[in-house]
């Protein structure tokens, strides 16, 4: 099998395609959450804390000189990134919790209520054979 054929077989598998779709949706979801945090959550928090813009919070280690930009530790952006992470993690947790709940309900519904007709018939045959051996 050639390398191209092997790659086609690999790429055609359903789980690879599902993974690609998940990555694309995850990237889009990450952008939505980043916008939500930066544009919706952080401005009111900054207002409550006295008009602070978190994206501008930084410690300057070395001031800008000519064309050389300043060396800063942008801890405000880091705080926003942490909040992004917490929201995304919580959303993933809630999604997985919902999926696990659905799976559990399906497993409970799929559990057989009792022996099937085949099992009952086999039990009767077994009992008859035992009674014939005992005579």
Curated annotation (Swiss-Prot):
Protein name: Large-conductance mechanosensitive channel
Originating organism: Aeromonas salmonicida (strain A449)
Family statement drawn from the similarity comment of this UniProt entry: Belongs to the MscL family.
GO annotations of cellular component type: plasma membrane
Record-linked PROSITE patterns: MSCL (PS01327)
Transmembrane parts of this sequence: 9-29, 79-99
Compartments where located: Cell inner membrane
Keywords for the protein's UniProt record, in alphabetical order: Cell inner membrane, Cell membrane, Ion channel, Ion transport, Membrane, Transmembrane, Transmembrane helix, Transport
InterPro entries listed in its UniProt record: Mechanosensitive_channel_CS (IPR019823), MS_channel (IPR001185), MSC/AndL (IPR037673), MscL_channel (IPR036019)
Quaternary assembly: Homopentamer.
UniProt function note: Channel that opens in response to stretch forces in the membrane lipid bilayer. May participate in the regulation of osmotic pressure changes within the cell.
GO molecular function per UniProt: mechanosensitive monoatomic ion channel activity
Classification via Pfam families: MscL (PF01741)
Topological relation to the membrane, as annotated: Multi-pass membrane protein
Principal location listed in the UniProt entry: membrane
